[in-house]
Regions:
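Hydrophobic N-terminal alpha-helices or hydrophobic patches in metabolic proteins across all domains
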Residues: 1-190
Length: 190
């Protein structure tokens, strides 16, 4: 039984932002802000964010990390997303975002992909990601730092992880649509 201690009901936030006008406009919920060692996770049973672990000294989250509401990954957990904002947000932050691609990973033999999203373009405010429409627009060193971190983080957790490459935003959108269908199917049974 879920406790009603959280006034914010993340399950009621739609996957897609902008009323669906732009198929790549999505919502993201931040669990772990960038530049810290703590790993937070949303505890669905209690409706609150919880400290899940602390990563090794010398490693920090390179970008905000969270999930997409109303979407499940192949592992049955909320679909993971790296939010490539210039500055950190905070745990529990809801943001509109632009889907730009997907990092393909195998963790212990199972798909465990990470979507990549950027903040929306804001009139009068320049952001490093303004020119990113697809994953190919990302600088190679930025992608390398993300994939290196994900592999190191997984290995620290004693998971066998394999980097399988990256894919375009259209492939990321397909993964997101599949994840949204999985979420609807799971919640229809309740």
């Amino acid at each position: 039984m879920k406790n009603d201690i959280n006034a914010t009901h993340y399950e009621n936030i739609p996957t897609f932002a902008d009323g669906g006008k732009d198929k790549y406009a999505i919502h993201v919920i931040i669990e772990t802000p960038r530049d810290i060692r703590n790993k937070y996770r949303f505890d669905e049973e209690n409706g609150i964010f919880k400290l899940g672990s602390v990563i090794a000294e010398g490693l920090t989250w390179p970008y905000d990390y969270g999930f997409i509401p109303q979407a499940l990954g192949d592992d049955g957990d909320p679909l993971d997303v790296l939010f490539l904002a210039d500055e950190p947000t905070f745990t529990g932050c809801l943001s509109d975002a632009r889907l730009i691609g997907i990092i393909r990973l195998l963790k212990d033999g199972e798909e465990n992909d990470r979507l990549l999203a950027c903040p929306p373009r804001m009139k009068g405010v320049a952001q490093k990601t303004d020119d990113f429409d697809d994953i190919d627009d990302m600088p190679e060193d930025m992608m390398q730092s993300i994939t290196t971190f994900l592999v190191q983080y997984s290995e620290e957790k004693k998971n066998k992880v394999e980097f399988k490459g990256v894919a375009s935003r259209s492939k990321a959108l397909k993964a997101l649509e599949t994840g949204h269908k999985s979420w609807k199917k799971k919640h229809k049974k309740r």
